[in-house]
């Protein structure tokens, strides 16, 4: 049942965003601020876009599946040194994606001269990113609280049942009663520890699902941007940058999925959704390229809002759920060498993704 609900939610987000862009493409455009050169070679751009679909798909699959290979290779399992270093790299990638790729895009769209009126003088991009980050915190907090309370109630029922069983022994003597009570108390401690572990597991799963939603929103937008582009130079640059972009983002999401200890079906569904989102976005962009005008006010608002919200989600997730959680982990805190390696990996990941901002 939970898997079905997750699939429906992801499908809803994906198709809602896709249909939103199709609806935008059907609208009239009266702004001539940023049309591409009329002499752009559409045929030249098309070959790059067609090649990008399988290439970006393969890059996404490689990226998201690499951390999931921990089931077969012990060195890739969560809480190993290699996993911490790899996850720090992925966190740097996601942080740079939010700050260097998505947020500037949002600012560019929502501050375009094509948007007339005093209302657009308000810094909507930063405001929307802030609200998205707060909402992500709320989802994180309330979901964790819900699972914590659910496991506390379950542990309490088990403890009450054991006490009733112990009381029903009656004439077994004080020694036997003491033994049963001690035994029940031990089970209570184990139950509490198990409950805390389950709460943390559920929180990790919530983090993975929220992160995937943020990535999907951004991936659809950037995929449609490539698909709708009419310039061969733009398409070529986006093609190359998107391959690395998709691979690195997949690395971060795959690490989060691996820690969530999902079942095989959930892993498959989440991996497929991540991998196909950008290629399908490219296909949608190609389909609407003849009528889509990314300089129309409606298109600018839609892209700006989605980019700003996605940036808020990605920045929050990278700082709070990736970096803060891992860098404060007891294993990291007790190992100076691991801390240095993780910091270097973080800087490399953020640096590489920041460099890619020149092209995508």
Swiss-Prot record:
Molecular function as annotated in GO: zinc ion transmembrane transporter activity
Signal sequence interval, chain numbering: 1-26
GO cellular component, one term: plasma membrane
Origin superkingdom: Eukaryota
A Pfam family hit: Zip
Cytoplasmic face residues: 71-81, 140-205, 258-267, 321-339
Membrane topology category: Multi-pass membrane protein
Keyword Signal: yes
Purpose of the protein: Probably mediates zinc uptake from the rhizosphere.
Name this polypeptide is given: Zinc transporter 5
